[in-house]
Structures are given as structure tokens and as C-alpha cells.
Regions:
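Alpha-helical lid/collar subdomain of P-loop NTPases
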Residues: 51-92, 100, 273-278, 282-397
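C-terminal recognition-helix end and immediately following basic linker
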Residues: 6-33
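Cys/His-coordinated zinc-binding microdomains
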Residues: 3
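Short, basic alpha-helical nucleic acid-contact segments in DNA-binding proteins
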Residues: 28-49
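Active-site catalytic microenvironments for nucleophilic, acid-base chemistry
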Residues: 16, 132, 212, 330-334
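DNA-binding alpha-helical recognition surfaces that contact promoter or target DNA
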Residues: 11-15, 128, 326
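AAA+ P-loop NTPase catalytic core and its hallmark functional loops
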Residues: 49-294
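Short, surface-exposed acidic
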Residues: 21-26, 33-36, 288-299
């Protein structure tokens, strides 16, 4: 068209002629747009390269916690539990060991009782395993007033009269999950959260389901149905079945020993080490990390100090991952609303947890544990020259 030569004409056509490659080829269908030298070079570099089809979906495997495990690619993700936000498997401390043993039980399909302090990641572990491995699962939460029978079936009526209608849990136990494409039938994972809040009668519904000989479930009218082989019952709780022993989980009940005995594995979860928790927190609160990165070091040292004291029964409190997120979350809320980072930012964030202490004595003990790690300190309140309390509005919040 103009005699210009280059390895590729696309840029020249756009800059000099305001024309796209498609428009150029419409006018000159047989014209070359890439130099033959370039085509020859690409052909030479691609010699010996073999293309292969992706693996068959039913034969997908992955490495997880040191184990080679199968991924059910033909299971709809919506049939699995959702992946927790920014979840990562820990690699330090007691919790890393706890998860390793829990993973063995999970992967082998054992009925599992997981207990531990609030915020130690009990439910999150099951959610992550279900989501990553495409294991169909449903979750139920126990409260003292829950009608667990309604999880299985309910009485219904219409113009033709009354009848029993089976519910999601009953169908999961007796029918399993049918993969939409392959039509394979897979057993469900049934996650029951806060199981130690169950009353004696509520807990009884699991007795037949986790029977060591053959799982069964009682249907309407007393008829007994077989549970799909491989169905896995996992429950989470704050206590190990003996009720509240610390005075902090007052709604926890004692669980019948024969029911506890039917759980094939019992695993205790501990709190996460800060080395594992820090990258999760930075991912959850990116604005705070961008504007005040040193705050994570202060909160991290405070976290380690508090949890050590709680583990020794020196502090009558809990400091879970939820508490850490509450602290950091309030700090991020502040930096989002302010142009300059307040000097007492970490202290103000700590208040959202400290104000939840059961009494002044416990609050002061917690303040003393973290005061040395927070630059502005957390004990006492600054006052201006008039003696009035100096709050955030005085700093132009």
C-alpha cells in the first residue's frame, strides 16, 4: 500500500493509516502481515513439542497436606461447602499437626469429632477440604431449640390431605449425591457445627447414623433406612464431650459417652501460630497493610503474648482469629476514613476486644500483657492541657 516493510505490519497500519489488520486484509486478502523470517523462527522453535489433551475430569489428583488425593471434578461446586475467605493450611505449631491428623481421618472417610477453642478453624478446615476436593457436603448448626427431626422430614398437607416430606439431610443420607454428567453416586459429608450445644435428645439422632456396623436413619413412622456407604459425619464443638470445664462455654452440654464412642476419631484443634496467621491477616486487610504495615508486627506480638497467658490459665478470656480480625478490622476502618494514620491506631483497634472483657480486673490484666508491644501503649487515656479526655475528634477524625 505504501511500500513500508517490517517484521509485523499491525503497528504501522494503525499509526500511519489508521487501519486495523482486519480492514487491511479485507482490502488485500493475500497480503502478508508477518515476515516470513518470523514464521520460520516460530516453526523451528516449536519442533518436537507435543500437545496432549487435559486429564480426564474423573482422574484428577492433587497434592494436599502431603497426600496425593483425588478431586471430584464432576461434582458441582455449589454442592460443596464454600471456601473460607483467604484460607490457608497452617505449617507452624500445634495447629499444623492437628490438621495433618484431621486430614488423614477426613480423607479416609472416618466419623470425626473436632473440638477446640473458639476461632481455631474447626469448621473452616472442613469447608476448605470440601471445596478443594469437590466433596459434596451440607452443614447444620445445633442450638438448644433446634428441631433436629425437621432436618430429616416434616409433616405437610395440601388439598389431598397430610403427608410426610423428606428434607435435605434425609435425602443426603439415604440417596447420596448424583454427579450431573457421570451419574456417579457419591456419599455426602455432613458437618454439624456446635454439636456440644445439643441436648441429650438432639444428640440421640446420630446414634443410628454413625453405628459402627451399618449406618441407618429412622424415617417417618419409625421405618429405618440404610445410609449411603461412605457417608461421613463430622461434628465440631468447643468442648470434648464432658461439658464446660473452663466456665467460658456455659451453653455446652455433656454428650452421652456411647455416642462419643461411635465417633471413630477425635481431634483437638489449637490456635494458629502468628507466622501462619500474619499472611492471612495481611490478605484480609490490604489497605491497613499498605498504610500501616508495622501495625501487624505490634498486633502479632500482642497475639502471641495473650494466647500464651490464656493457655497457662493466667488470663480468663479467649483471643481467637475472630478477635484478631476484629482488632485489625477496626484499624482498617479508621485508616479508610482518615487522611493521616493516627498515632494511637493500634490502641484504638485493641479497644474493640478489650471492651468485651467480663470485668475490669481481666481487662487490666489483658492490657498489661499487650502494653509493651503497642507503640502508643494501651493503658490510660491521653488528656489535653485542660485535663479533658483527648479523643479522636480532637485529632480531626
Amino acid at each position: 500500500m505504501c511500500g513500508f516493510q517490517d517484521y509485523f505490519l499491525g503497528d504501522h497500519l494503525a499509526e500511519a493509516h489508521d487501519m486495523s489488520l482486519d480492514a487491511y486484509l479485507e482490502s488485500f486478502p493475500k497480503a502478508a502481515t508477518v515476515a516470513q523470517e518470523v514464521l520460520d523462527s516460530l516453526a523451528e522453535r516449536s519442533k518436537g513439542i507435543q500437545r496432549s489433551h487435559p486429564p480426564v475430569p474423573t482422574e484428577l489428583y492433587t497434592e494436599l497436606l502431603g497426600f496425593k488425593v483425588r478431586v471430584n471434578a464432576d461434582v458441582d461446586p455449589l454442592a460443596c461447602l464454600p471456601m473460607p475467605h483467604e484460607y490457608r493450611f497452617p505449617s507452624h505449631g500445634d495447629l499444623a499437626v492437628d490438621l495433618q491428623e484431621a486430614a488423614v481421618s477426613f480423607l479416609r472417610g472416618r466419623h470425626l469429632y473436632i473440638h477446640g477453642m473458639p476461632g481455631s478453624g474447626k469448621d473452616a478446615f472442613v469447608h476448605a477440604m470440601s471445596a478443594l476436593l469437590r466433596r459434596p457436603a451440607i452443614i447444620k448448626t445445633v442450638t438448644p431449640t433446634t428441631d433436629v427431626e425437621a432436618w430429616l422430614y416434616v409433616r405437610s398437607f395440601d388439598q389431598e390431605g397430610t403427608r410426610w416430606e423428606t428434607q435435605e439431610l434425609f435425602r443426603a443420607l439415604t440417596e447420596g449425591y448424583t454427579c450431573p454428567n457421570s451419574k456417579r453416586v457419591l456419599p455426602y459429608i455432613i458437618l454439624i457445627s456446635d454439636f456440644d450445644r445439643a441436648t441429650k435428645s438432639q444428640a440421640e439422632f446420630l446414634r443410628l447414623i454413625i453405628d459402627s456396623i451399618s449406618g441407618r436413619v429412622q424415617g417417618p413412622g419409625g421405618k429405618v433406612f440404610s445410609v449411603v456407604p461412605g457417608t461421613q459425619i463430622i461434628v465440631t464443638a468447643n468442648t470434648s464431650g464432658g461439658g464446660d470445664v473452663r466456665g467460658r462455654m456455659v451453653s455446652a452440654n455433656v454428650i452421652d459417652g456411647s455416642i462419643m464412642d461411635r465417633f471413630e476419631r477425635k481431634i483437638q484443634f489449637h490456635w494458629m501460630e502468628w507466622d501462619d496467621e500474619e499472611p492471612i491477616c495481611k490478605a484480609k486487610f490490604p489497605i491497613l497493610f499498605e498504610r500501616c504495615p508495622d501495625s501487624f508486627r505490634q498486633v502479632g506480638k500482642s497475639t502471641t503474648s495473650l494466647r500464651s497467658s490464656i493457655a497457662k490459665d493466667e488470663l480468663y478470656a479467649e483471643f481467637s482469629h475472630r478477635a484478631v480480625c476484629s482488632w485489625l478490622g477496626h484499624m482498617e476502618d479508621i485508616v479508610v476514613l482518615t487522611k493521616e494514620v493516627p498515632k494511637d491506631l493500634v490502641k484504638r483497634g485493641a479497644r474493640t476486644w478489650l471492651d468485651g472483657m467480663p470485668d475490669e480486673e481481666t481487662r487490666l490484666a489483658a492490657q498489661k500483657l499487650i502494653d509493651a508491644y503497642v507503640k502508643s501503649g494501651v493503658i490510660g487515656t491521653e488528656r489535653d492541657s485542660s485535663g479533658d479526655r483527648k479523643g479522636p475528634l480532637a485529632e480531626g477524625f
